Amino acid sequence: SRSGWSGERGFEIYSKDRNFDGVELWEYLLEKGSTAGLIASDISSMHTRRIEAGILDYGTDIDQTFNPYEIGLGRLVDKEKEDFIGREALVNTKRTALRLLGIKCEKTFLTRGDKLFEGAGSEAGFVSAGGWSPYLKYGVGLIRLNESRPTNYQLRISTSAGEFEGEVVQ
């Protein structure tokens, strides 16, 4: 399955057997997989992988205030379709630049709620989800901006460790 929260290949195991021992299966799989480098991980690794893959989480990254164009999903709107719920609103929606983008910071990890500032000091938005990417070797995050913007520019990120420069990416 690649439909999970992280976008990685994985498996889901279901059993109708009431006597099924999930712990026993878990220990067996870890033991047999250890020779191939299989290790257990926690939710934070899946969270970071989700951010790297750009998989959005409703309630964390997006909510009802966003339209499909602001989050990069405008290509999924079929304006030629005769009728569907919300059609009129979407047809009349001005296509704007994105309000939900990615950000990278080479100096520190990012956390939900870190504030974003423009050069002049005005608040530009906040980090909706963040972490450190061991694969990319820098801080990564999804950001919610106060207004639609293009990509490839710098913002200041105010974190618990101080203020750092971050590059806005798609």
Name every feature range the model reports, one short phrase each.
Residues 66-170:
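Glycine-rich, small/acidic residue-mixed loop/short-helix segments
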